[in-house]
């Protein structure tokens, strides 16, 4: 089973396209929607929904994946639920770059201070990070610097921030999922 979390643009047709691409490596792809506007509510909702779909599945190796803000949540929720994560161009600091776009961006900072101390050290090797060199939203050299001590980082030479096409990374995802 692959759990897919959308980014900030929850209505993008690219979400459906990514789900179709993910179905090439796993028939069971679950899309979990969340508001993107209320971080504390989103965290509670995502924890509940992800836990529920894990319980419903008989897959011994489920993974959670997301793009942008969905990558932010995939890393945290996957860690808290004990499953591996694959993140594409994750937004590591929504408390800084979502100001004016969501109601309470400061809640992301509050979530970070209440999260398990040094969770990335405890999650080491359980997240695959795919970063685009052509990301027009974030400086992914900073993202790589923040994550490379904990996770494998794969660079993509073509895709933009929204990562419309993930098919070139599906076999790496499948191998990571089943390892």
Swiss-Prot record:
Coiled-coil blocks: none
Designated name of the protein: UPF0227 protein VS_2073
PANTHER family noted in UniProt: ESTERASE YQIA-RELATED (PTHR35602), UPF0227 PROTEIN YCFP (PTHR35602:SF2)
Organism: Vibrio atlanticus (strain LGP32) (Vibrio splendidus (strain Mel32))
UniProt xrefs under Pfam families: UPF0227
Source superkingdom: Bacteria
Family according to the record: Belongs to the UPF0227 family.
Gene3D superfamilies hit by this protein: alpha/beta hydrolase
InterPro entries given in the database record: AB_hydrolase_fold, UPF0227, UPF0227/Esterase_YqiA
Classification of source organism: Bacteria, Pseudomonadati, Pseudomonadota, Gammaproteobacteria, Vibrionales
